[in-house]
Amino acid sequence: MFAHKLNVSVISPEKILYKGEVDSLVVPGSEGFFGILPNHAPLVATLGIGVLEIRKGEKLKNISVEGGFIEVKDNTVSILTDHGALKEDIDIEAEKKALAEVEKLSPSDSKNLLLQKTKTRILVASR
């Protein structure tokens, strides 16, 4: 029998960011974005830095994620992120100030990583 929903849990070390039934996900994988629909094949993958999109009906919820893992099995999706943030938890003005400070740094891999993380949080907060 085919299911029409996914049971999703998004967990960071700090808290449970989301738990519930959803229609679909768009996930920032370490090698690019991918979609998850009900009855997806079993999957384990690593997460990159980006916006996790959770769709339930006409509603879209965005969560900033910074690395971690996803497991999909039997319409249950477990997402464990190294760090995640909900829109309501992000101080957009503080993130914009942090972005200005990061942009002053000399070019490096760590600067690029900080830029990506900060821009992702700003994107989630502004949606």
Swiss-Prot record:
Q: Which GO terms describe its cellular component?
A: plasma membrane; proton-transporting ATP synthase complex
Q: Transport: present as a keyword of the record?
A: yes
Q: What's one Pfam family here?
A: ATP-synt_DE_N
Keywords attached to this Swiss-Prot or TrEMBL record, sorted alphabetically, are:
ATP synthesis, Cell inner membrane, Cell membrane, CF(1), Hydrogen ion transport, Ion transport, Membrane, Transport
The GO molecular function terms of this record are: ATP binding; proton-transporting ATP synthase activity, rotational mechanism
Q: Does the keyword Membrane apply?
A: yes
Transmembrane segments in this chain: where? none
Instruction: Write down the SUPFAM superfamilies for this protein, in alphabetical order.
Output: Epsilon subunit of F1F0-ATP synthase N-terminal domain (SSF51344)
Q: Which NCBIfam families is this protein grouped with?
A: ATP_synt_epsi (TIGR01216), PRK13444.1 (NF009979)
**Family indicated by similarity:** Belongs to the ATPase epsilon chain family.
State what protein this is by name.
Answer: ATP synthase epsilon chain
Give the organism the record lists.
Leptospira borgpetersenii serovar Hardjo-bovis (strain JB197)
Q: List the lineage, top down.
A: Bacteria, Pseudomonadati, Spirochaetota, Spirochaetia, Leptospirales
**Gene name in the database record:** atpC
